[in-house]
């Protein structure tokens, strides 16, 4: 599985700011979108382009345009919504496919409760966004769902990943690409990433 830890200075700086324990909801939300934007830049670097001729201000001009499959952004509810706007800054015409999954706090297993996907998933590149890749359960369940709907080109964008989650994702879906702003140390006994960001969903929405 292709794993890319984006080590650009801006990404490292912004993730560092997000680790502050007393960060405000407003600031955390802004940074989540900003890092999501930077991860999108990296994740789309291999998109193919084609040369087309358009009418410029002084006559015809050849320009590059992205070709191939269209894109759908897949936020995993609820925390994934915090990264979605950052992706749409670069791909404003992308379709949005929503997947609702929460993690059972006792078993740490993913529990799906909602889905609304683009009708032509087999013709699209899916960019899944979720702030945390902890155990990997929610991400794996989401990818399972997308593949059942015919999607064959999938990239996952996360702010922070745990080694345990990366290992689980690779075992389940080695064909998927993972882009993360940081690979952290480990999970604690409750399945939270250390040092991590805390509960990203609570911090993005300001509610528990």
Swiss-Prot record:
InterPro entries tied to this protein: PRibTrfase_dom, PRTase-like, Upp_B, UPRTase/APRTase, Ura_phspho_trans
Pfam families xrefs: UPRTase
Function: Catalyzes the conversion of uracil and 5-phospho-alpha-D-ribose 1-diphosphate (PRPP) to UMP and diphosphate.
Gene: upp
GO BP: UMP salvage; uracil salvage
Top-tier EC class: transferase
Record-stated family: Belongs to the UPRTase family.
Catalytic reaction list: UMP + diphosphate = 5-phospho-alpha-D-ribose 1-diphosphate + uracil
Activity modulation comment: Allosterically activated by GTP.
Gene Ontology molecular function: GTP binding; magnesium ion binding; uracil phosphoribosyltransferase activity
Residues engaged in binding 5-phospho-alpha-D-ribose 1-diphosphate: 78, 103, 130-138, 199
Cofactor: binding comment: Binds 1 Mg(2+) ion per subunit. The magnesium is bound as Mg-PRPP.
SUPFAM superfamilies: PRTase-like (SSF53271)
Residues holding uracil: 193, 198-200
Pathway field: Pyrimidine metabolism; UMP biosynthesis via salvage pathway; UMP from uracil: step 1/1
Keywords: Allosteric enzyme, Glycosyltransferase, GTP-binding, Magnesium, Nucleotide-binding, Transferase
EC id: 2.4.2.9
Cofactor(s) required, per the database record: Mg(2+)
Transmembrane segments: none
Name of the protein in its database record: Uracil phosphoribosyltransferase
Keyword Glycosyltransferase recorded: yes
Nucleotide-binding keyword on record: yes
């Amino acid at each position: 599985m292709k794993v890319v830890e984006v080590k650009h200075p801006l990404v490292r700086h912004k993730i560092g700011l997000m680790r502050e324990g007393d960060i405000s909801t407003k600031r955390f939300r802004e940074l989540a979108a900003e890092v999501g934007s930077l991860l999108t830049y990296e994740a789309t670097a291999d998109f193919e382009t084609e040369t087309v001729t358009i009418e410029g201000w002084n006559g015809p001009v050849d320009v590059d345009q992205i070709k191939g499959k269209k894109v759908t952004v897949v936020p995993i509810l609820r925390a994934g919504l915090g990264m979605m706007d950052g992706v749409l800054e670069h791909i404003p015409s992308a379709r949005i496919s929503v997947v609702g999954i929460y993690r059972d706090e006792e078993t740490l297993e993913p529990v799906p409760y909602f889905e609304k996907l683009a009708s032509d998933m087999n013709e699209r590149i899916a960019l899944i966004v979720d702030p945390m890749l902890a155990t990997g359960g929610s991400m794996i369940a989401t990818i399972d769902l997308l593949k059942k709907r015919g999607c064959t080109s999938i990239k996952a964008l996360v702010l922070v990943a745990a080694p345990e989650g990366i290992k689980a994702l690779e075992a389940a879906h080695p064909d998927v690409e993972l882009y993360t702003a940081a690979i952290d140390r480990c999970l604690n006994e409750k399945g939270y990433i250390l040092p991590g960001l805390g509960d990203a969903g609570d911090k993005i929405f300001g509610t528990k």
